[in-house]
């Protein structure tokens, strides 16, 4: 849900809504969901859709925090998928374990 950023302004990351979650998605700002990950419109409910929030089959691109993305910061990921984009301490990657 909307939360204050470090600058004090409000930002939106994502929210779980049942209809979207059933498709494996999360509700996030439509503009931050890559085109190939956009789900059917309206799965997040009318109230959210009116605010530019739609169902995305991945974590929206504006979410940079590793834990929020479902990962864990560590220096070695082994064979696990990883992302160097989210915020992790220097020398660590955001690893996604099952």
Swiss-Prot record:
<protein>
    <recommendedName>
        <fullName>U-scoloptoxin(19)-Tl1a</fullName>
    </recommendedName>
</protein>
<keyword id="KW-1015">Disulfide bond</keyword>
<feature type="signal peptide">
    <location>
        <begin position="1"/>
        <end position="7"/>
    </location>
</feature>
<keyword id="KW-0732">Signal</keyword>
<keyword id="KW-0964">Secreted</keyword>
<keyword id="KW-0800">Toxin</keyword>
<dbReference type="GO" id="GO:0090729">
    <property type="term" value="F:toxin activity"/>
</dbReference>
<dbReference type="GO" id="GO:0005576">
    <property type="term" value="C:extracellular region"/>
</dbReference>
<comment type="similarity">
    <text>Belongs to the scoloptoxin-19 family.</text>
</comment>
């Amino acid at each position: 849900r909307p939360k204050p950023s470090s600058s004090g302004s409000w930002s939106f990351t994502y929210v779980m809504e049942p209809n979207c979650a059933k498709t494996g998605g999360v509700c996030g700002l439509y503009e931050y969901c890559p085109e190939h990950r956009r789900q059917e419109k309206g799965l997040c409910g009318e109230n959210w859709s009116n605010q530019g929030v739609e169902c995305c089959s991945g974590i929206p691109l504006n979410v940079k925090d590793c834990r929020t993305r479902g990962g864990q910061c560590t220096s070695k990921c082994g064979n696990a998928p990883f992302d160097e984009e989210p915020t992790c301490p220097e020398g660590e990657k955001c690893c996604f374990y099952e």
